């Protein structure tokens, strides 16, 4: 989860988020090199006493500033496409969960079970226990198994919402009348927090998301106790 005054991303919890972090660092390095080169050229132009007044057509230079940006764009596009296709890839998910956005709570339905569904509301500040996080805790957490592919179907009952969990690299729009899907695989157990990331009304900031990732045997015990 995020901490006050934190710089950078949250720790990656899924392979997708790791790829996103690598792509971010890769792109940031390219931007840094380009910015350094441009700054160097500007400083050189401002400090040099040499002036070229008869340079009207230099074909070699035109080829360089045409080919070099094309190469840079390819270096950015290739890893970007790899990550994009990785995010959309869904192979034999162990579990499918239908997530519906409402004003202003989430409802979860485990479609592989007959009667495993519940609503998830934010816990108000005056009901928090010691150690719980303000505006981030819910009464019913979404419990999932670790190290296994899970498919999440996202939609909305009323207005636009967005189901987002930053540490897993997830952000999927919840659109009324449309079903979007996303896959997640957690590499470690724990609690992972998110929030609705699409302005959806007066209580938009009171729609937290809490994922509790547990080993498979604990997930089976939890699902058996509720089903």
From Swiss-Prot:
Residue ranges crossing the lipid bilayer per the database entry: 15-45, 60-87
Entry binding sites for Mg(2+): 198
Keyword Membrane: yes
Keyword list, A-Z: Copper, Electron transport, Magnesium, Membrane, Metal-binding, Mitochondrion, Mitochondrion inner membrane, Phosphoprotein, Respiratory chain, Translocase, Transmembrane, Transmembrane helix, Transport
Role played: Component of the cytochrome c oxidase, the last enzyme in the mitochondrial electron transport chain which drives oxidative phosphorylation. The respiratory chain contains 3 multisubunit complexes succinate dehydrogenase (complex II, CII), ubiquinol-cytochrome c oxidoreductase (cytochrome b-c1 complex, complex III, CIII) and cytochrome c oxidase (complex IV, CIV), that cooperate to transfer electrons derived from NADH and succinate to molecular oxygen, creating an electrochemical gradient over the inner membrane that drives transmembrane transport and the ATP synthase.
Subunit structure: Component of the cytochrome c oxidase (complex IV, CIV), a multisubunit enzyme composed of 14 subunits. The complex is composed of a catalytic core of 3 subunits MT-CO1, MT-CO2 and MT-CO3, encoded in the mitochondrial DNA, and 11 supernumerary subunits COX4I, COX5A, COX5B, COX6A, COX6B, COX6C, COX7A, COX7B, COX7C, COX8 and NDUFA4, which are encoded in the nuclear genome.
Name of the protein: Cytochrome c oxidase subunit 2
Species in which this protein is naturally found: Elephas maximus
């Amino acid at each position: 989860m995020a901490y006050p005054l934190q710089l950078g991303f949250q720790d990656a919890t899924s392979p997708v988020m790791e790829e996103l972090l690598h792509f971010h660092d890769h792109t940031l390095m390219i931007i840094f090199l380009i910015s350094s080169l441009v700054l160097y050229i500007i400083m050189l132009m401002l400090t040099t006493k040499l002036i070229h007044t008869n340079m009207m057509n230099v074909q070699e230079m035109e080829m360089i500033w045409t080919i070099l940006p094309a190469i840079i764009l390819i270096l950015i596009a290739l890893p970007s496409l790899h990550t994009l296709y990785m995010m959309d890839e869904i192979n034999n998910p162990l579990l499918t969960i239908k997530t519906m956005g409402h004003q202003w709570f989430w409802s979860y339905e485990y479609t592989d079970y007959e009667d495993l569904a519940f609503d998830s509301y934010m816990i108000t500040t005056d009901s928090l226990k010691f150690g719980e996080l303000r505006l981030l805790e819910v009464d019913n957490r979404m419990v999932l198994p670790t190290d296994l592919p899970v498919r999440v179907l996202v939609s909305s009952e009323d207005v636009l919402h967005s189901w987002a969990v930053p540490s897993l690299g997830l952000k999927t729009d919840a659109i009324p009348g449309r079903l979007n899907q996303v896959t997640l695989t957690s590499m470690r157990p724990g609690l992972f927090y998110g929030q609705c990331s699409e302005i959806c009304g007066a209580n938009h900031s009171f729609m937290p998301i809490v994922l509790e990732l547990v080993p498979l045997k604990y997930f089976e015990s939890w699902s058996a106790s509720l089903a």
